[in-house]
Each structure stands twice: as structure tokens, then as C-alpha cells.
Amino acid sequence: MSSIDNDSDVDLTEDLAVAKIVKENPVARKMVRYILSRGESQNSIITRNKLQSVIHEAAREENIAKPSFSKMFMDINAILYNVYGFELQGLPSKNNMNAGGNGSNSNTNKSMPEPLGHRAQKFILLNNVPHSKNFDDFKILQSAHTYEELIVTGEYIGDDIASGTSNTLESKLSTDRDLVYKGVLSVILCIVFFSKNNILHQELIKFLETFGIPSDGSKIAILNITIEDLIKSLEKREYIVRLEEKSDTDGEVISYRIGRRTQAELGLESLEKLVQEIMGLEKEQTKSLHDDIIKSIGDSYSI
């Protein structure tokens, strides 16, 4: 039997197993709908207590005994991964994320442990659908083209109801706000990464000014939010971690590090691809890229 036949048999076995779960575990079905809905609307971290509460409520509605969390976690992920291409991943303790912060490379090569699975206290929904560069490029080009059409005499008219909705980014695979948000987020994360995972608040703001992001309290165009409020939002979503220290000379000193969500969503390999794209490097030019990045990002992927 060929390896292709073996792979087909494995896929069929997995499909049958997932179909059995979908059929026999109504609580898992409801949990998957809840998790996907929450991920779509809030893009937030989900606590273990919240998941247990929803599981308990779903079990009560189905008039069945409350199942174990570990079994539910396994069945939920089986459906998420095999049907939708997602994974519910446990996050490491937040206390570990606050350790360090001196910008040294002492922990750079300390790899992150295996995912905590059902034992974690907080979880994040990850998209495991294989990356398609051509499709992503198409979305970006389409979004950028549509955005340009919303600039009239130097003014953005996307928020003007009178302009209609037939040609908005939302109707063309993306939204203008989403495009800007992801762009600013990428800039902020790269600044923190390549400041060896330790940057002062004032330094971050200065860097962002060079990208045209206002620091005078005025709102960022399209996002309609100040940079201070955006940073607070990124803290809340745990893309970055805020550290506060008391100094006899400078008073309160605020700095930032990479957060758990970024570690989970943007792994080292993804960061390498991002740098490769930004720098326009061909494959043969990336031989030393991994080592160069490791030297530059401090303990960003340590815990």
C-alpha cells in the first residue's frame, strides 16, 4: 500500500471520529459555536471559568450530566481543527510573562514549553488554516485599491453614510478599519520585538511618530482612537505586556514586552516570514535570517 493510500485511510478515520463527536456530543457542538462566535466578535482571550460555565449551561439545556473539562476540550478541538481549521490553545501563566524585562539575551534560546492544553487557565482561538500567500496578497491589493477610492480631495470618506456602501472595504473581503488596525499592530509588535523585548513607553511613542501616528492626543485616522487608547486595547488583548517600575529619579517608568497572545499568534517562524516579506529577501538570502532575528529580539519567545 502506498503512502498516499495510508494518508487517505488516516484522513478517513479522523473524519469518521469527528463525525461521531459531532453526532453524539451536542455540548461540544454548542461550545464550538460559542467559541467561534466569540472569536469573531471579540477576538479575546477566554478564561477557563467562562468555558466551564458555558459547558455547564449547555449540559443543563441538553439534560445530560456535566462532562469533564478535559474530555470536552479534546472534543471541541477535534471539531474546531478538522471542520474549521482552528485550535483552542492554552496560554502560559501571566506571571511568567512579567519576569525578566532587562532586555538581555539570557533567556533568548529558552524555548516555550508544550501547550498546556486543557490545564491552562486562559485560552486563545488560533487559525491553523495553511497560509496562502497569493490569497493574502490579493486581499491586501484589493483592500488598498478600495481604500484609495475612498480618498476624495485628500479626505477619507469611508465614514460618510451618504457615500453609500457598495464600494466599501467591508464588501470586498476586508474593512478599512481592520486594515489600519493590523498595520499599526504589526508596527508596534515589530518595534517591541526588535527592541529586544523591552521598550520604554516614551521610546515606543517616538518610534510610532515616525510612522505618522499622532502622539498629541488626536485620534488615528480611520481607527478613530488615540494611540494611548490603542495601546491599552493591545494590553487588554495581551498582544503586549505593560510593566511599571518606580524610580527615585524618573518617578514611574512604564515599559512594554511581548504578550502571550503575540507568542501564540505570531510564532518565530511567522516573524521570520514577516521580516523576509518586508525586506524583500529571496529564499537564498535568508540563510542567516533566523540567527540574526534571534540576536535582535531578546527573550520575546521565552516564558
Swiss-Prot record:
Predominant location: nucleus
Subunit structure as annotated in this protein's UniProt entry: Component of the Smc5-Smc6 complex which consists of KRE29, MMS21, NSE1, NSE3, NSE4, NSE5, SMC5 and SMC6. Interacts with NSE4. Interacts with NSE1.
Name this polypeptide is given: Non-structural maintenance of chromosome element 3
InterPro entries xrefs: MAGE, MAGE_WH1, MAGE_WH2, MHD_dom
Other observations noted: Present with 2540 molecules/cell in log phase SD medium.
Role description: Acts in a DNA repair pathway for removal of UV-induced DNA damage that is distinct from classical nucleotide excision repair and in repair of ionizing radiation damage. Functions in homologous recombination repair of DNA double strand breaks and in recovery of stalled replication forks.
Record has DNA repair as a keyword: yes
Keywords, sorted A to Z: Cytoplasm, DNA damage, DNA recombination, DNA repair, Nucleus
GO cellular component, one term: cytoplasm
Matches recorded under PANTHER family: MELANOMA-ASSOCIATED ANTIGEN MAGE ANTIGEN, NSE3 HOMOLOG, SMC5-SMC6 COMPLEX COMPONENT
Subcellular localization: Nucleus; Cytoplasm
A Pfam family annotated for this UniProt entry: MAGE
One Gene Ontology biological process: DNA repair
Naturally occurring in which organism (per UniProt): Saccharomyces cerevisiae (strain ATCC 204508 / S288c)
